[in-house]
Amino acid sequence: MKKILLVLICICLLASQIPNVWAQTSTSKFNPYLFNWLKFSFNPIPFPNNSYIPLKVKSVVFRPQGPTAAINHNIDPHLLNWLKFNVSPITHLPYSFYIADKDKPAVYRHMEAAGSLQGSIERTITHEGMDIYDGAVYQIVLSMAGGQENLNKASLPDQYYWQGSVGDTWNIRAGYPINTFVYDPKDPDRVSSDISRLGERGFIFRIIDADGNYLVTDPMDGKKSIAGFPDNDRLHWTDWKPVAGENAWAVIAAMQVYHKKYFDSAKGVYARPLGSVELQLARELARAAMILQSETGGIRMAPLGTYRGLKKEEEKDFNENNWWYDHISTENNISWYAAFRMLYQVTGEDKYKKAMEGIKKYLRFVWDEKQGMFYQGAFYKGGQWVVARENFALDVQAWSIDCLGPENLDAWFGKGAAWALWQGAKGHSGVFDKQGGLLGVGYTDEHDRVSVEWSAGAMMALTELAKYYKNQDSQKAREALADRSSMRKSMENWHYKISQSLGAYSYSSRRGEIPFGWNSHDPEVLSLASTGWMIFVDAGFNPFWLI
């Protein structure tokens, strides 16, 4: 009987003329309910058992000075409460954003300026989306806070990622051949989209619907259809991009949760379940990333098949399916450096150290010796890799200090490199008051917009610099702390009290285009990433390191 039922369901699926749903968008003709039932009824995803083995920690001498600071767990309960409050009632995954009901009409109208189609997509993402980077920040905050309830919540995203589906979205893992994402052109099947091929699956899509919806409704006016919407007029989830940087943070979060759960600091070992979800997921995503590692040592932004609408000037060098594959992001690689470091520290496997050395090689390639800063990235053109000079990226500079540490930067690029890097970054993106006090930093070459999240990353960098210079240059240490203090005070301009028990921080100080493919939001749009990073700053917790 089961075989007959299976055949009937397969006929139904074929009759529905399923398109390639994993290019830019999907279509409402696809029936995710049928496919979910079919996939999991006949081939459920196994979860690891709970037997334990000891695993010694690999001694990694990358950070002679130790953690940023003693973790003081100075977590504002209003912020932590908000993180745990702003979750889907259906899946219990966190939302990336929050907008108070009174602010929604104006905020949503501003998004309409991009056109009804793009406005609808942006509103849907803001209303019910979860960027997996934001989800990682949520996981790390909860693991840092500790306690069984928080650890259970922190573990939940990894359970979904390992399962490979969320609600009606039957597959959140990008590979081949169910969808046509190719990591290795010589062996497309090397990274799979078959969610039953554990350990061989591809990246997670960067933004997923936290409610698990495939079909969506425009939150501004309740519309369910728009003429000309991609693939089908019926509104549906459209963001299917498996981007390297977001997946690095999925690994970082998994390793932070794993470290919190299983590390015995007294014995210096991990007492872990055989094949814990966190470690298995981290290994699997790292495998896909290493396959994307180019001859420069840098990890490509995404596999072949990741869609991008091209600008006119890009059409001669790229097509819609290879733009992401032929670009490398320095920010993405800094994140992967931290992810590989954590995996090497825990497992001691040399392949992760080798991957780190590759990224180190890439970072030397994109170091602008003249300005003493990192280029945003690189791209493949005319048979060779070329550095991307078009746009300055503030987060690359701050995160390099956070992740690599001032001591390593000085060792790699010369004495004083870390300090000069910060001074240059502040010159490009600092926002100042009339007295010259530093209010925050923006995204690129600008002095009139503050990113709360990127400012928090800069404050973390200043903490690292102050500690590094404390015993060798007290003047630099004082300057770093002064900049940090000035920015921290300024951040309260974008701190919103939602209720007596809930508070959160804005995404940014104003709406505007960011030259890296997205928009900053009105200050009324509260952000999981901003709020989480402010918690990191106040707690003295650097998420790039296992502490």
List the predicted regions and their residue ranges:
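Non-membrane alpha-helical segments in proteins
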Residues: 134-144, 249-253
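Extracytoplasmic Gram-positive cell-surface binding/anchoring modules and repeats
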Residues: 127-128
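Extended ligand-binding clefts on enzyme/binding-domain cores
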Residues: 37-118, 132-133, 149, 156, ...
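Sec-dependent signal peptide recognition
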Residues: 2-7
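Cysteine-centered motifs
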Residues: 10-12
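C-terminal segment of classical bacterial N-terminal signal peptides
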Residues: 14-21
